[in-house]
């Protein structure tokens, strides 16, 4: 512990090393699993599941340490402010993470595909595939015999069939949950713990419903639409963006579940509930990303 009692400095920890190891296993496992899609037998998922076990194990121990230290009164206002800034910078890094993906999508739609179709200043590239027509989504790829495009896309079918469009229900779930988490936090600030708990349960329920609908959407894409990772640039960007977003929703739902369990256990007060506030910020973030 630091000799300066005004700012608690934890003892050195090996947890960041284990977290880095878990993330390494995740990258290797996820890449291997994707490469092995379609193979009759593969053990790549074992590596992926191991990475999840390591990551969640480290997070459990790490967060437990932070909670115990806070309950013992080791944290000052200055340190609590450090947590606020830390969460803010973490969300900013996530914004940049998704910004890179949106930038890639924009580049493909505005430049790469038109160039391949004979449009724009670099239209000479269309000599490679003279029959290719630049449209988005790309349903017919330049080399469609080798890399067949999707048979159907995820575009909105029209207002009259909106109720049959899974992304509509996904959006409804996330937007609603963003409101319910705000109501939960407002109830806690007013000391209404029963309402706080109820709104938290509603929020995490909507979050996991979103995850279920996302899985159903992926099943429909693969089984009935021909929309796969190999269905050209449209399939690649679709699963890249929605897949990483879905992962973040899972992470956010688990965080809010932990906050809910802690809330039922008596944690948080009207003035001391940063864990809940941080989870709420993160949840609003994934909501905005989905709408974009």
Predicted segments, located by residue:
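...captures the hydrophobic TM-helix bundle architecture rather than a specific catalytic motif
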Residues: 1-292
């Amino acid at each position: 512990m630091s000799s300066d009692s005004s700012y608690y400095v934890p003892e050195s920890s090996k947890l960041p090393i284990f977290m880095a190891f878990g993330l390494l296993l995740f990258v290797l496992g996820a890449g291997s699993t994707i490469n092995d899609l379609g193979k009759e037998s593969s053990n790549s998922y074992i590596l992926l599941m191991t990475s999840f076990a390591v990551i969640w194990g480290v997070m459990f121990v790490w967060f437990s340490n932070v909670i115990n230290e806070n309950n013992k009164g080791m944290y000052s206002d200055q340190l609590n402010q450090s947590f606020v800034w830390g969460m803010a910078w973490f969300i900013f890094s996530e914004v940049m993470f998704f910004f890179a993906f949106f930038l890639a999508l924009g580049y493909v739609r505005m430049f790469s595909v038109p160039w391949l179709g004979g449009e724009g200043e670099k239209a000479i590239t269309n000599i490679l595939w003279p029959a290719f027509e630049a449209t988005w989504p790309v349903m017919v790829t330049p080399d469609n015999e080798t890399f067949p495009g999707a048979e159907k896309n995820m575009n909105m079918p029209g207002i009259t069939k909106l109720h049959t469009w899974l992304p509509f229900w996904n959006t409804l779930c996330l937007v609603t949950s963003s409101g319910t988490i705000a109501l939960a936090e407002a109830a806690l600030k007013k000391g209404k713990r029963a309402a706080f708990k109820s709104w938290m349960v509603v929020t995490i329920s909507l979050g996991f419903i979103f995850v279920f609908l996302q899985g159903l959407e992926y099943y429909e894409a693969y089984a009935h639409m021909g929309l796969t990772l190999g269905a050209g640039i449209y399939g690649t960007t679709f699963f890249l963006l929605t897949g990483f977003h879905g992962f973040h929703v899972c992470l956010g739902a688990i965080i809010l579940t932990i906050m809910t369990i802690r809330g039922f256990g008596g944690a948080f007060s009207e003035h001391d509930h940063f864990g809940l506030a941080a989870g709420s910020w993160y949840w609003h973030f994934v909501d905005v990303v989905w709408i974009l």
